[in-house]
Amino acid sequence: MKPIGPLMWEHRLIEKMLSFFEAATRKINEKNKVDPLFIDTAVDFIRTYADRTHHGKEEDILFRDLIKKQLSQEHARIMEELVEEHKYARNKVGMLVDAKERYLKGGNTSQEIVVLLNELARFYPIHIEKEDKHFFYPCMDYFTKEEQARMLQEFFEFDRNMIHEKYRTVVDRIEAQSV
């Protein structure tokens, strides 16, 4: 299996999660009420799965190794765009958290939340298509079969460590709140 296999599987789960955003925005528009639990769950999914786990493998492993190669101008440009797009998504998620917090304090941010959910739901499919159809496959040509096998193993190790990282952070946050 090529190392892009797990990345593309992760894309399918991200797309599935995003498919729930439309129903969430419809409910907000119908009831003029935000479900903070849905927002928290969506944010946790995007931050932990889409960003830290998925984008982490891309940036910390795939892109790190690609930088060492003689990339074509097109592939170098696309990789730079992808990094900027990851930053864009992080920013939008931060804005979503901020809007939800203001909502919980009585702010009228329901439409801001709708806009942010819609922006994320529009952004990710385009970003995913760019990776799946224009970047991942051609980039594998820069690596030998042995390099690809090592990268795949590094992806698996990265995933194994993620659960520990996530819950270490949870415990640290609870500890900080209890002091």
Show the residue positions of the predicted features.
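Small-residue-biased structural context
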Residues: 1-179
